[in-house]
Curated annotation (Swiss-Prot):
The active site is at 562. One of its GO terms (molecular function) is metalloendopeptidase activity. One of its GO terms (cellular component) is mitochondrion. GO terms for biological process: peptide metabolic process; protein processing involved in protein targeting to mitochondrion. Signal peptide: none annotated. This is Mitochondrial intermediate peptidase. It is found in: Mitochondrion matrix. Belongs to the peptidase M3 family.
Length: 776
């Protein structure tokens, strides 16, 4: 049952309290609601100051770093090889995690708690009265496992102390292995199956219980539980084989030839510094992979050199093609074992799309809509080529696109140079402050910087932001680890460390004796909810003594994107943790985050925060507008490329039996046929599909981001484009999309927010309609 542990960056949960609870209760809503305007204004100003002003941050954080017995290493992070008594609490207020050794104790206590819940579930096999609450018990079991696995996953990515990273790794491995045993438990599956076969009990279930129970049941089936002994053995063998083949594919994922050899004359136009790095004597050795190869395509004047490089860049190694084809055949075998015609059918059954045919309808509609714009963008480059070559019959080839695009952008940038850099208006503090102001206006929630206890965070650069509702008080806790440091993952990400769920009355008495039950909670309308705790990590430059960390526009978009996930975690409050916040369909989960990116470019929202870090003067919007125009020169060409990649993903994970001859699968023919369909350039030999690494990680789901971006664009245009800071629009987004997490059919969510009932049932017509929606 994979729902026993979903990815950490996709969790959330809330909890009610009562006098019988030993949980840590959050501050009363009265502490945050009804504040004097001056206090609220002071809290707002503090957001910018704690990120941008080193002196303010030092004073503000001193309480949490000034423990006498606590030592610091030369890199500035806390040395955790000390006594537990040195700390007021552990990581994320988990008292187990004051030292690395506490991870093992936390894991052991969690497994003991899980064991008690499993015994309750197994008791339902012989005691029918226990079936009624089996689904909520399954959900509690899932929550216990996730709190260890997801916390460990985050610590592995962000903690600077190797001892803690190692402890987290060991905890993750131990709990993941334990979870996999449960995922394939016939006894646990039988309990859940009995629930749904008892019509009297089914009629008593809440909507959420039915949704979660169905998800868990399907996950059990996808894990092969319903197969006979031989089938289960085959299932385990195939999944192991697929994992190994995937690793082989990724490791061999490179062009057939590592470089091409050119003369100095043939490589003319290369950046001088790059040319010097690649030269040996009179020869230039241009790599066929990575950034140097891309830069060479943009710079080399000789078309034959570009053609040679481009063709070699798109010629995959024999090993890569072989690994990919073995991977695809094994996935087909797994799908057939599970009664599906293709791997895409197997994977998409619980997604918005439903099946691969619906995905292709969406992609075809989007491609037809995108193609004219893409051709128009390339026609501009073809005219530049004709002028440059003096040949009116010149045709733009695939290897010409990067070169002439760079020529065009160079001309445009020369005409639009400005003395002020955009980043000077985007300090980390102003951007986070702006996000808080935007959320306050559209959702009635905001950020309040909060001092941390000793031991609560993993590095002194980490800021804690409490997420506060104007009506409910504290509804979530966010830890912002935004600045780069050695050993930290460079990839921006949102992690849900502790998610939201209701704590039921029968749990409260047990919590007083449970060592893992100390969690911050929220009392709301007579219910107790666990407060969600999330962490954001980014890789922004470290603030300087003389100026704050300044962001590029792309980094601003990144922060808005990740905050979209964060707010989904905070507002997606459900009774069951399996469907809270970002725990929804994978082809729906990016909608809130992509939607948030729109606020990073809108003049009205920018006016709330985009100010010069030194003079405090507002951003001249024309400056950003020019930058945005430059970035959009080839937006349809880029979208066309992404659509074709998503189509390739579907084709290769479709019913490929017809392409298997004498036990051998020929992927090249499928790739060639797709390339011939509505092309942008004249045909040329290529086996690039063997270098498309996402075919492993995103198998049959590469379309998801395109679908979510399309839906986000539609929502923005219909609700927010005319009045982006509208509380009415924000309330609709919150009430129809965010608050449901994964407990509502995503098609009903999108139909509700767009007020388009035709979309509510989903299916082929809904997918096609979304693909053809006018977003301009």
């Amino acid at each position: 049952m994979r729902r026993f542990s979903t990815l950490s960056r996709r969790l959330q949960r809330v909890v009610p309290a009562s006098s019988a609870s030993t949980a840590n209760t959050s501050p009363s809503p009265a502490l945050y609601t009804g504040l004097e305007p001056k206090i609220k204004e002071s809290q707002d100003s503090l957001i910018r100051a704690v990120f941008d002003n080193g002196d303010v941050w030092q004073d503000f954080s001193q309480k949490s770093v000034a423990k006498p017995k606590q030592s610091r290493s030369i890199t500035g992070f806390i040395n955790y090889l000390t006594n537990e008594s040195d700390y007021e609490t552990g990581l994320f207020m988990n008292d187990f995690l004051k030292t690395p050794a506490g991870f093992q104790k936390y894991t052991a206590a969690s497994i003991e708690e899980a064991g008690q819940l499993i015994q309750q579930l197994l008791g339902a096999l012989t005691q029918r009265d226990k079936l009624r609450h089996a689904i909520t018990t399954f959900d509690r079991l899932s929550d216990v496992l996730c709190q260890v696995i997801d916390l460990a996953e985050f610590i592995r990515a962000a903690h600077p102390e190797q001892h803690f990273v190692q402890a987290a790794q060991e905890a993750h491995e131990q709990m993941y292995e334990y979870m996999n045993v449960l995922n394939t438990s016939v006894e646990l599956y039988t309990v859940l199956d009995m629930v749904f076969k008892d019509s009297e009990i089914v009629n008593q279930l809440t909507h959420e219980e039915k949704v979660v129970g169905t998800l868990l049941l399907e996950d059990f089936k996808k894990s092969g539980v319903t197969l006979d002994d031989a089938g289960r053995e085959n299932f385990v063998s195939l999944t192991t084989k697929i994992s190994l083949l995937g690793r082989d594919f990724i490791s061999s994922n490179h062009p057939k030839e590592d470089y091409i050899t050119l003369t100095q004359g043939e490589a003319q136009g290369l950046d001088p510094q790059l040319a010097q790095q690649l030269s040996q004597g009179n020869s230039v050795y241009v790599p066929t992979g990575g950034v140097p190869g891309q830069l060479a395509l943009r710079g080399m004047k000789n078309e034959n050199s570009r053609k040679l490089l481009w063709s070699k860049m798109r010629e995959s190694s024999d090993k890569s093609i072989e690994s990919l084809e073995d991977l695809l055949v094994s996935r087909l075998e797994l799908a057939n074992l599970m009664g599906k015609e293709s791997y895409a059918d197997y994977l998409l059954s619980d997604k918005m799309a439903g099946n691969p045919e619906n995905v292709m309808r969406f992609l075809n509609g989007l491609l037809d809509k995108t193609l004219p714009g893409a051709k128009k963008e390339l026609s501009v480059l073809e005219q530049i080529k004709k002028q440059a070559t003096g040949n009116p019959k010149s045709i733009l080839q695939a290897w010409d696109k990067s070169y002439y695009a760079s020529q065009l952008l160079y001309q445009k940038r020369n005409k639009t140079k400005t003395a002020h850099m955009l980043s000077e208006y985007f300090s980390v503090g102003t951007v986070v402050q702006g996000l808080s102001r935007i959320f306050d206006k559209i959702y009635g929630i905001r950020f309040v910087p909060t001092e941390t206890k000793t031991g609560e965070t993993w590095h002194h650069d980490v800021r804690r932001l409490d997420v506060v509702s104007e009506t409910e008080g504290l509804i979530g806790i966010m830890y912002a680890d935004l600045f780069q440091r050695e050993g930290k993952s460079p990839n921006p990400a949102h992690f849900t460390v502790r998610c939201s769920r209701e704590i039921y009355p029968d749990e409260l008495a047990h919590m007083s004796s449970s060592p893992i039950a100390k969690v911050p909670t929220l009392n709301l309308n007579g219910k107790v909810f666990q407060i969600p705790t999330i962490a954001l990590i980014c890789d922004f430059t470290t603030p300087h003594d003389l100026y704050p960390s300044l962001l590029s526009y792309q980094e601003v978009e990144t922060l808005f994107h990740e905050m979209g996930h964060a707010i989904h975690s905070m507002l997606g409050r459900t009774s069951l943790h399996n469907v809270c916040g970002t725990r929804c369909a994978t082809d729906f989960v990016e909608l809130p985050s992509v939607f948030m990116e729109n606020f990073a470019s809108n003049p009205e929202s920018l006016a709330l925060f985009a100010r010069h870090y030194s003079s405090d003067s507002p951003l001249p919007y024309q400056q950003l507008e020019r930058h945005l125009n430059e970035q959009s020169y080839f937006k349809d060409v880029e979208q066309y490329t992404q659509i074709k990649m998503a189509m390739l993903d579907q084709v290769l994970h479709g019913n490929i039996l017809k392409s298997i001859t004498n036990g051998h699968f020929n992927s090249q023919k499928l790739y060639d046929n797709l390339e011939k369909d509505r092309p942008l350039f004249p045909p040329s030999p290529s086996s690039w599909h063997g270098s498309f690494g996402h075919l492993f990680g995103y198998g049959a789901s590469y379309y998801c981001y395109l679908l979510d971006r399309q839906m986000a664009d539609i929502v923005w245009k219909k609700l927010f484009s005319k009045n982006p800071l509208s509380r009415d629009a924000g309330s609709r987004m919150k009430n129809e999309v965010l608050q449901w997490g994964g407990s509502r059919d995503p098609w009903e969510c999108i139909a509700g927010v767009l007020e388009d009932p035709e979309l509510a049932k989903g299916g082929s017509q809904a997918m096609e309609k979304i693909g053809n929606y006018d977003k301009h």
